[in-house]
Every structure is written in structure tokens, then in C-alpha cells.
Amino acid sequence: GFGMLFKFL
């Protein structure tokens, strides 16, 4: 989910 994207940020 978007959780992974937020981790990269």
C-alpha cells in the first residue's frame, strides 16, 4: 500500500 511510499519519503 501507500505505507511503503511514505517510508521512502
From Swiss-Prot:
GO CC, sorted alphabetically, is: extracellular region
**Which tissues does it occur in?**
Expressed by the venom gland.
The UniProt keywords, alphabetically, are: Secreted, Toxin
Location of this chain's protein in the cell: Secreted
MF-aspect GO terms: toxin activity
Main subcellular location of this protein, as a coarse class: secreted
Q: Which family does it belong to?
A: Belongs to the cationic peptide 04 (cupiennin) family. 08 subfamily.
Supply the name of the protein.
Short cationic peptide-4e
Recorded source organism is Cupiennius salei
